[in-house]
């Protein structure tokens, strides 16, 4: 599986079977992403919540590629009114798309649709667990603060292999809280996100990596630059 960070919370995931998954596709207005939005050809798009820096280019890319946008029910209703192909889901629910299982889990954050003049309710903020055909699990936390279910539900029940976690502070967890979340989730690999896009969330990711190393040195923290890939091979992370 290839994981490409696009800056902020946007990721492109390409499975070994060739499924292209785009998460929180904030691309065209993302100062950290230098890749033109026209270059993306997703098979499915995931949106964790309604803020414009996460919904991003989802509607344009859905129309261009005729692919669904998976989002919480309230965002799904909005997308339907715009004529956008979508899959509505809610916290704790799952669906299977082309052999891959997608599970919507909790996040602690606000959510409105702020791309319209009068912001609309957008349900709860969420996270996604992606389970590939070979059993590999990737967790995208969305925007979130630290909360106990990261340990008791996400870590102990779902057991992701890879965790993508925000570290920017102010609007989400900061580096230390994110390191605690990383220890609780206990993934094999952790990739920081949602930082250095704008001045209020400037962070040195090595501080986060150092905190994780102190809490659990067995977790591999992978720090990517926007546009860089990480290739995950389960054979390299055997227990």
From Swiss-Prot:
<comment type="similarity">
    <text>Belongs to the UPF0173 family.</text>
</comment>
<dbReference type="Pfam" id="PF13483">
    <property type="entry name" value="Lactamase_B_3"/>
</dbReference>
<dbReference type="InterPro" id="IPR001279">
    <property type="entry name" value="Metallo-B-lactamas"/>
</dbReference>
<dbReference type="InterPro" id="IPR022877">
    <property type="entry name" value="UPF0173"/>
</dbReference>
<dbReference type="GO" id="GO:0016787">
    <property type="term" value="F:hydrolase activity"/>
</dbReference>
<dbReference type="InterPro" id="IPR050114">
    <property type="entry name" value="UPF0173_UPF0282_UlaG_hydrolase"/>
</dbReference>
<dbReference type="InterPro" id="IPR036866">
    <property type="entry name" value="RibonucZ/Hydroxyglut_hydro"/>
</dbReference>
<keyword id="KW-0378">Hydrolase</keyword>
<protein>
    <recommendedName>
        <fullName>UPF0173 metal-dependent hydrolase Msm_0779</fullName>
    </recommendedName>
</protein>
């Amino acid at each position: 599986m290839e994981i490409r960070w696009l800056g902020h919370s946007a990721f492109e995931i390409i499975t070994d079977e060739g499924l292209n998954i785009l998460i929180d596709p904030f691309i065209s207005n993302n100062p950290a992403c230098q890749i033109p939005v026209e270059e993306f050809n997703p098979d499915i798009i995931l949106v964790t919540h309604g803020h414009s820096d996460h919904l991003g280019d989802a509607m344009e890319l859905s129309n261009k590629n005729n692919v669904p946008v998976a989002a919480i029910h309230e965002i799904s209703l909005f997308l339907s009114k715009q004529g956008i192909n979508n899959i509505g889901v809610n916290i704790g629910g799952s669906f299977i798309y082309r052999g891959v299982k997608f599970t919507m889990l909790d996040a602690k954050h606000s959510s409105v649709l702020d791309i319209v003049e009068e912001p609309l309710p957008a349900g709860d903020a969420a996270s996604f667990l992606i389970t590939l055909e070979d059993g590999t699990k990737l967790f995208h936390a969305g925007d979130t603060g630290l909360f106990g279910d990261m340990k008791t539900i996400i870590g102990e029940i779902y057991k992701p292999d890879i965790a993508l976690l925000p570290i920017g502070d102010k609007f989400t967890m900061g580096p230390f809280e994110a390191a605690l979340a990383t220890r609780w989730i206990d993934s094999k690999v952790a990739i920081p996100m949602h930082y250095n896009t704008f001045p209020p969330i400037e962070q040195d990711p090595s501080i986060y990596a150092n905190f994780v190393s102190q809490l659990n040195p067995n977790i591999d923290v992978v720090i990517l630059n926007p546009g860089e890939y990480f290739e995950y091979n389960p054979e390299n992370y055997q227990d």
